[in-house]
């Protein structure tokens, strides 16, 4: 275009004058135009001066950058007008013009850089822009980075400043960034992906992030890359664990555990689990089962590998109850072999339980106290050390912990004392449900163990809540359950025992109910005779069972763990329960009661209703008057509606028992509906 313009002839009479300053470009002019004839010589001027000691850099941008940068000149006219002022600042300068396509790169006293792409701009303006590689990200991404640099002067900021500002942090710490991963946008995540490419380190985070081909792979690479290398330093393991915990994986799939299975050492597998998910905890129980089969000791595993990361399993494996040495020794053996998940053989020690009180005898001592009974179905003494651990975590120390015996047979229907003797009782069924059948869509026994352990953290929390409104909480179970009795059900070398004629076999053969017409019976070997509600039973005293069909833990093998525990028999894990009494550290203020809305009530046909309010929430209420029981119902707001019938007097004195404690009497004033009683018929005139 310039050459065509230069060579165009103009009329001699034309008064048009075009002056085109071309800076530092005589060599380019000579190359494009070549020789000039004598008619043109008078129209080319070269303004020259002594070489400058200064070097100048002028970046020429396309209009697409007009909103992303603050140029020194926002068009060519401004540049022609102010270039001397701009260059005098002695800093790199910038021009935005639509003529950027006609600009050529030049080097020398004045360096000219035409810039059309966002990446080229970044490489130009960032102090360490040379470390960036354009193919790492898309043009749209680099454009967003350009927007982040609009307030920086050229060469005064580096890429790390851009990243830190975008992440709103003062220094880059991968664990802190990972903890916010779910709240970061795609742009911020891609900056993290770029960080270790621009600034690689010897940290595990750097190694794993550089393995990610895109930002979406970062969590997976952080989690998995350490499983694929042969040498894992303790530092890398610690860094990986901190990052994985921060990323908070909600679940792990089978492919992840397949990678874990390839690791040669079981100890390493346990070290690489976060124990934040149910799947990981289940996998840990599986790994520990293999370790115990190979001769490892439960206490050693618990102390060195579990106490910090999975304290509930550590407690289950190593803690003792401390009430009875024989029982502690047996339960330690039982818990170890339960995790091994193999039938251990014959019942190791024939035990008698005469030295232990019945459960109700121990609980009866709290009768008359402000005490709530918390029953956990299936809470055998197997779990007592774990529950004590969970209470301790919450700063709760029981007043007493004692072993007691459940009633034979050890089934709930023979042990439901909570609805026989205690109006202030709650009951949980989840532990027993887990023990019998696991979860509806999960029949792994190792998974079942994890569910069982989780009950006691929740139970300790429940105790804490109950103590807010009660002086005492007593925790117990109706019975325990036996894994080995379930495994024995399918053992070829365990021969079922034939039940007496006309008896009914119950609970997978753990006991049988004798016919009412059966005469005196001598207990069979390994059985005990029991009586309940006029019925007689033969109860198994070991892991054997009466002959009956069923599928308790059917299909369980070393490679395939199948859920299932049963009860009804007389083994220690089925028969022994704990009675744990917990008292508030500080006494509660006495419960007080007052009628809601005042003392007056309306009577209609002898029927009276009144709401009573209490100074704190109560669980049970008994109200009587003139030896008549009132009907009491708790309202949604915590007040209680008391309904009285057969009222004949004008004053009603109520006897109130709240939470098992007798409160001061409450007197109500009765008025009959539709009749107003006036004790002064003369209106106060004094006659």
Positions of predicted regions on the chain:
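…; additionally, a secondary subgroup of soluble metalloenzymes is captured
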Residues: 1-371, 378-473, 477-687
């Amino acid at each position: 275009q310039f050459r065509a313009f230069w060579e165009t002839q103009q009329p001699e009479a034309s008064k048009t004058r075009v002056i085109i300053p071309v800076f530092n470009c005589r060599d380019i002019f000579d190359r494009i135009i070549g020789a000039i004839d004598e008619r043109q010589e008078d129209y080319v001027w070269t303004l020259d001066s002594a070489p400058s000691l200064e070097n100048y850099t002028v970046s020429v941008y396309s209009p697409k950058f007009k909103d992303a940068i603050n140029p020194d000149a926002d068009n060519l006219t401004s540049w022609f007008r102010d270039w001397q002022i701009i260059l005098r600042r002695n800093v790199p300068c910038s021009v935005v013009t639509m003529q950027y396509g006609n600009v050529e790169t030049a080097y020398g006293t004045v360096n000219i850089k035409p810039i059309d792409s966002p990446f080229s701009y970044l490489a130009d303006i960032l102090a360490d822009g040379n470390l960036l590689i354009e193919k790492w990200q898309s043009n749209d991404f680099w454009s967003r980075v350009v927007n982040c640099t609009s307030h920086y002067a050229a060469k005064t900021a580096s890429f790390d400043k851009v990243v830190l500002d975008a992440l709103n942090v003062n220094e880059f710490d991968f664990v802190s960034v990972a903890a916010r991963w779910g709240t970061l946008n795609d742009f911020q995540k891609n900056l993290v992906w770029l960080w270790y490419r621009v600034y690689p380190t010897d940290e595990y985070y750097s190694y794993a992030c550089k393995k990610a081909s895109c930002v979406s792979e970062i969590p997976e690479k952080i989690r998995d890359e350490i499983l694929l290398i042969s040498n894992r330093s303790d530092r890398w393991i610690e860094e990986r664990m901190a990052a994985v915990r921060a990323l908070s994986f909600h679940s792990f799939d089978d492919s992840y555990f397949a990678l874990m299975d390839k690791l040669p050492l079981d100890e390493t597998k346990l070290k690489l689990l976060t124990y934040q998910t149910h799947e990981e905890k289940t996998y840990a129980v599986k790994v520990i089962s293999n370790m115990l089969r190979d001769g490892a000791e439960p206490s050693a595993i618990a102390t060195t590998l579990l106490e910090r990361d999975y304290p509930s399993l550590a407690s289950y494996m190593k803690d003792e109850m401390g009430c009875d040495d024989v029982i502690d020794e047996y339960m330690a053996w039982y818990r170890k072999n339960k995790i091994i998940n193999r039938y251990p053989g014959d019942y190791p020690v024939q035990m008698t339980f005469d030295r232990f009180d019945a459960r109700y005898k121990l609980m009866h001592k709290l009768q008359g106290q402000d005490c709530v009974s918390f029953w956990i179905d299936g809470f055998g003494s197997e779990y007592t050390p774990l529950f004590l651990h969970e209470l301790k975590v919450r700063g709760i120390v029981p007043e007493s912990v004692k072993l007691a015996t459940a009633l034979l047979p050890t089934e709930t229907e023979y042990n439901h004392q909570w609805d026989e003797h205690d109006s202030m009782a709650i009951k949980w069924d989840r532990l027993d449900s887990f023990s019998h059948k696991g979860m509806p869509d999960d029949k792994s026994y190792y998974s079942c163990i994890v569910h069982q352990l989780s009950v006691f953290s929740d139970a300790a929390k429940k105790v804490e809540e109950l103590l807010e409104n009660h002086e005492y909480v007593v925790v117990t179970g109706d019975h325990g359950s036996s894994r080995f009795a379930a495994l024995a059900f399918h053992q070829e070398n365990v021969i079922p025992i034939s039940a007496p004629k006309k008896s009914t076999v119950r609970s997978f053969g753990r006991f049988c109910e004798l016919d009412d017409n059966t005469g005196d019976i001598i207990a069979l070997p390994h059985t005990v005779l029991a009586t309940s509600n006029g019925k007689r039973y033969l109860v198994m005293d070991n892991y054997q069972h009466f002959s009956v069909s069923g599928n308790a833990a059917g299909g369980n093998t070393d490679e395939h763990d199948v859920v299932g525990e049963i009860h009804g028999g007389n083994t220690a894990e089925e028969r022994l329960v704990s009675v744990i009494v917990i008292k508030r550290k500080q006494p509660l203020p006495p419960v007080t009661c007052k009628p809601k809305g005042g003392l007056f009530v309306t009577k209609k046909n002898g029927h009276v209703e009144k709401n009573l309010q209490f100074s704190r929430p109560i669980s049970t209420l008994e109200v009587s008057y003139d030896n008549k029981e009132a009907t009491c119902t708790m309202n949604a707001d915590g007040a209680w509606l008391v309904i009285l019938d057969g009222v004949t007097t004008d004053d009603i004195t109520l006897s109130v028992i709240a939470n098992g404690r007798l409160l001061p009497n409450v007197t109500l004033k009765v008025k009959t509906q539709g009749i107003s009683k006036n004790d002064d018929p003369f209106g106060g005139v004094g006659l």
